[in-house]
Amino acid sequence: MEPLVSVVIPVYKTEKYVVKSVNSILTQSYKNTEIIIVDDGSPDSCPKICDDLQKSDNRIIVIHKENGGLSSARNTGIDAANGKYVFFLDSDDTLYADAVSDMVKIAEEENSDAVIPDSYYKVFETDDRTVKAYHFTEKDFSCDPKVFALNVLIGKGRASRSTAVLYSMKCIKENNLRFPLGKISEDFFFNLDFLAVAGKISVYKKPSLYNLKREGSLSASYHKGFFDTILEMDEKVKEFTTKIDNKKYKEYIGNKRHSLLVKNTLVYAMSIMKSEQEPYGERVALCISIFENSRVKEAVSEMSEAPFFPGRAKTAFIKLLFGMVKKNMYRLACFTAYIAFKLAGV
């Protein structure tokens, strides 16, 4: 008999999208699923929509709870899940029709704790464009979870997304893995914890997810105070590299911790300069305070080249910013980022 797959869908203020999202699971070629919809105290019509969906198919379970955020909703879903595997899906995204079937087959045949897609589709709501994007290349992938974490999640700052990944429920529950509460970039923390304890992972060489890019979504927002999260991510990487067998993985560790910190810092500084929530001078002052952080300065000084970034134009721009920051040309770096956004929307 086909193993049961639990699909956890947190719902909050997505009344326009949730039905389409759930239907993308109901119409999967793989039928042995339980769909756990977690209404995270949504103040719109989502609770009623969820209840109506439950009436339409006996595979759907609806849990109503007080608002606690995305991590809280996902954790509620984990606690309720009965499947051999668990699959997370955001309530404004949809799945490729054979994704669950294909990924379960891979997990079963290769005895893997997770199956990770190498790519996904970005669907832009404003102009209805669909663009294929890659999490990582075939060359980057390793079935050793720790090597994958070091090379991709940490080394390139990629593939941190937990949605549309097939996870072993046994691995999650035996190691008491949960999404951290009250954090931005919760997927990164969860995946690093998972990869630290997983025995083997496999790759799905197709896009499994249609990821909706919409105005006002959580992932599209500029977050004040995100630098605190960047430093927490850096500490998490330090914890990860300390726990694993340094002798076995020494060649993979290198300066990847520094690289991720610098990449996250530069990207955040760029988002600050793009934002118009504060006056230009205040944005520059904030960026300078970040560049002068002792941990950032240490990481920059240890790196001889800019961190990885996808795309030629953005790679060139990151190299330019990195060179300025390395030479303590902070104000020029801020001005360059500001002008680039104004002229080209980098």
What is the meaning of each model-derived region?
Residues 70, 91-204, 211-227:
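Donor-binding/catalytic cores of nucleotide-activated saccharide
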Residues 86:
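Short aromatic/hydrophobic "clamp" motif used to bind/position activated sugar donors
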Residues 13-27:
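Short, well-formed alpha-helical segments that are part of the catalytic scaffolds
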Residues 39-49, 66:
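A conserved acidic beta->alpha catalytic loop
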Residues 3-6, 24, 34, 189:
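Cell-envelope/extracellular polymer assembly enzymes that use nucleotide-activated donors
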Residues 25, 40-41, 68, 91:
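Conserved short acidic donor-positioning loop in nucleotide-sugar-dependent glycosyltransferases
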